[in-house]
Amino acid sequence: MFTLKKSLLLLFFLGTINLSLCEQERNAEEERRDDSDKRDVEVEKRFLSTLLNVASNVVPTLICKITKKC
């Protein structure tokens, strides 16, 4: 009976370590996914700011040419 308890305790201990390692890997994968999302957001922000700058320069010129009040 004592050897059975030892074996079960050993299996439980090894299983706990295995689950802990899997959890760490999952967390690392989630962080990697989050990093790419952050990069996408940064790229979108850069793209939108560039687009707004171009629009702010072009729109007044277009309005001026359309209304012919330059």
Curated annotation (Swiss-Prot):
Signal sequence residues: 1-22
Q: Which UniProt keywords apply?
A: Amphibian defense peptide, Antibiotic, Antimicrobial, Cleavage on pair of basic residues, Cytolysis, Disulfide bond, Fungicide, Hemolysis, Secreted, Signal
Q: Which domain of life is it from?
A: Eukaryota
CC annotations in GO: extracellular region
Q: Which GO terms describe its biological process?
A: defense response to bacterium; defense response to fungus; killing of cells of another organism
**A Pfam cross-reference name:** Antimicrobial_1
Cysteines paired by S-S bonds: C64-C70
Stated role: Antimicrobial peptide active against a variety of Gram-positive and some Gram-negative bacterial strains. Has antifungal activity against a slime mold isolate. Has hemolytic activity against human erythrocytes.
Query: What's this protein's name?
Result: Brevinin-1CG3
In which organism is this protein found?
Amolops chunganensis
